[in-house]
Swiss-Prot record:
Gene Ontology cellular component list: transcription preinitiation complex
Any one Gene Ontology molecular-function term assigned to this protein's record: TBP-class protein binding
Superkingdom of the organism of origin: Archaea
Protein known as: Transcription initiation factor IIB
Residues engaged in binding Zn(2+): C15, C18, C34, C37
Gene3D superfamilies: 1.10.472.170, Cyclin-like
Keywords noted in UniProt: Metal-binding, Repeat, Transcription, Transcription regulation, Zinc, Zinc-finger
Organism: Methanosphaera stadtmanae (strain ATCC 43021 / DSM 3091 / JCM 11832 / MCB-3)
Xref: CDD domains: CYCLIN_TFIIB_archaea_like_rpt1, CYCLIN_TFIIB_archaea_like_rpt2
Job of this protein: Stabilizes TBP binding to an archaeal box-A promoter. Also responsible for recruiting RNA polymerase II to the pre-initiation complex (DNA-TBP-TFIIB).
TFIIB-type Zn finger ranges: 11-42
Family annotation (HAMAP family): TF2B_arch
Amino acid sequence: MKEDVAEMEKKETKCPECGSTKLINDHERGEVVCGACGLVIDDNIVDMGPEWRAFDHEQRDKRTRVGAPITYTIHDKGLSTMIDWRNKDIYGRDIPARNRAQWYRLRKWQRKIRISGATERNLAFALSELDRDSSRLGLPRSVRESASVVYRNAVENKLIRGRSIEGVVAASLYAACRRCKVPRTLDEIADVSRVSKKEVGRTYRFLTRELHIRLPPTSPIDYVPRFASELNLSGVVQSKAIEIINQAMDNGLTSGRGPTGVAAAALYIASVLLGERKTQRDVADIAGVTEVTIRNRYKELTEQLDMGVNL
């Protein structure tokens, strides 16, 4: 194999017909063509590069297969190694008893080296907390990555001092949910993060102000798929609810209204119209609002949009 590669490297760098050194490598056709006379010098060149394409540095890191991709959800970005707790070598054979004490010491020092400093200890604890909260909320990996970046930026800008790690993690998670359009309410974030809703909201406003994070208001439409899924409503009902919300937005009926309440009322109306009726209590429990809120939003939407729906 080495001889073949060496032979390929020694191939002529000029056209044997006209002597021109202006050679063109056409990788799509697998040919080397003379740019002067058009002679096809080689019609079977091999592309030694990867079979994938990457359009930026981050994509390249993720697609290369010479190691795990960089991730912001681990304090060292996944770049370090660790010694496995099982006392086996790379072939699966047990390590001799006389060497196990040495492996124990190596494993101990490896753990210390991976987390060597106050900042890394902070990140290690915070990111494990973030992973726990994300798992309980069922959030996708993209949200976890985004939340990890927000938290890291807060650490770099020294915004953690005087605030609880749990509170900053919860606020970062809330910001990431809004950025990725995977909405979760402050109540849901507070329930899993062991901090109050008030602290999460206050820390979120502080981070967005200090880190100059600009996030658009949450749309009621973003809540429809999740609420509909939990209520076992069909896709037709979801589409109808989104249609109702769009009409409400066009008529300015969502201004100053909580997005969860509007989404819940629209789903309730759509379920009644299409014969998949759910009780107000069921919808209210899923949306995290009161039945009174649903009735108020229901009344506004049906009257202003001229819908003939009976409770």
